[in-house]
Amino acid sequence: MKKKYRIKKNDDFQKVFRRGKSFANRQFVVYTLKQEGSTHFRIGLSVSKKIGNAVCRNRIKRYIRQSFHELESQINPENEYIIIARKPAANMDFHEVKKSLIHVLKVGRVLKQKPNNSK
């Protein structure tokens, strides 16, 4: 995922926190805010030091970014997303992270339904 599609600035994070909607499961909290006219979604990641050391935190962030990259065609391009990882995410492999993100995005109704004949 290109860096221009990431949320980095504190003001951008605060805007999504204040105006956006949130939904969660045991592993992740997702905040979403609709941005009219945007051609591509942006994501911001937050993984607390409580979750583990730098290696563990960076692994979780890589897994989340890769999951969004693979789900790119199903995700609404007019939204900004902030994903906050919770403690149970520390012990998950990539496939579990992706499955959990799919679940929480479906709960928030921001994931388009995948056609039955494609993988």
From Swiss-Prot:
Consists of a catalytic RNA component (M1 or rnpB) and a protein subunit. Its EC number is 3.1.26.5. Keywords: Endonuclease, Hydrolase, Nuclease, RNA-binding, tRNA processing. Belongs to the RnpA family. HAMAP family: RNase_P. It comes from the Bacteria. Pfam families: Ribonuclease_P. PANTHER family: RIBONUCLEASE P PROTEIN COMPONENT. GO terms for biological process: tRNA 5'-leader removal. GO terms for molecular function: 3'-tRNA processing endoribonuclease activity; ribonuclease P activity; tRNA binding. It catalyses: Endonucleolytic cleavage of RNA, removing 5'-extranucleotides from tRNA precursor. The keyword Transferase does not apply. RNaseP catalyzes the removal of the 5'-leader sequence from pre-tRNA to produce the mature 5'-terminus. It can also cleave other RNA substrates such as 4.5S RNA. The protein component plays an auxiliary but essential role in vivo by binding to the 5'-leader sequence and broadening the substrate specificity of the ribozyme. One of its GO terms (cellular component) is ribonuclease P complex. InterPro entries: Ribosomal_Su5_D2-typ_SF, Ribsml_uS5_D2-typ_fold_subgr, RNase_P, RNase_P_CS. It comes from Listeria monocytogenes serotype 4a (strain HCC23). This is Ribonuclease P protein component.
